[in-house]
Amino acid sequence: MKKIVVFTGAGVSADSGLATFRDSDGLWANYRIEDVCTPEALRDNRAQVVDFYNMRRREMLGKEPNAGHRAIAGLEKCFDVEVITQNVDNLHERAGSSRVTHLHGELTKLRSSRDPELIVPIDGWEQRLDATAPDGSLLRPHIVFFGEAVPMFERAAEIAGTADLMV
């Protein structure tokens, strides 16, 4: 069976109504990266960062996968398909894609602020400011902040290397 690897970014979810970051009316038009998407922002203004990602989760909750998400998921009927996405939403999974690698993290999960490999599903759609991980540390959004390494990069490169076709 042919292996197809599909690489997606903000454009695929924009058609579902999710705001992108860099468009003129995107998220960075209303927020400064330094204020909501850096380790320093989390350290210095935890409440603002948590509120920002809670807002993003609420936005995602009201959106549905679009024809692009469904078409990618539909490829699994005939091909071995893996999705590598820069998106932090769960629209690929909700459309039916069974193997999705999120390069920049996932809004539906939180992680330990001490151990980046200790990842837990969020309890509901709102992160509590004082939520703690099983290791006792504060939980943080499971998002790769600017200035942080991309932990799934090597895995994505491995997946891409197995493709008969990269889309």
Annotated model-derived regions:
Residues 1-166:
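Conserved catalytic core of sirtuin-type NAD+-dependent deacylases
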